[in-house]
Amino acid sequence: ALWKNMLKGIGKLAGQAALGAVKTLVGAES
């Protein structure tokens, strides 16, 4: 279904954003 694909896309974007935030935090600390 369409909404399933949308959820997949949103999940991917959220995951990438979370990874980016973690990398930024780790980079700022070191």
From Swiss-Prot:
Query: Which BP terms does GO give this entry?
Result: defense response to bacterium
Query: Where in the cell?
Result: Secreted
The UniProt entry lists the main location of this chain as secreted
Q: Which UniProt keywords apply?
A: Amphibian defense peptide, Antibiotic, Antimicrobial, Secreted
What tissues harbor this protein?
Expressed by the skin glands.
Q: Name one GO cellular component term.
A: extracellular region
> According to the lineage, what is the superkingdom?
Eukaryota
Question: Which InterPro entries does this chain map to?
Answer: Dermaseptin_dom
Q: Does the keyword Methyltransferase apply?
A: no
Annotated S-S bridges: none
Family under the similarity heading = Belongs to the frog skin active peptide (FSAP) family. Dermaseptin subfamily.
According to its UniProt entry, the function of this protein is described as: Antibacterial activity against Gram-positive bacteria S.aureus and E.faecalis, and Gram-negative bacteria P.aeruginosa and E.coli.
What is the name of the protein in this document? Answer: Dermaseptin-DI4
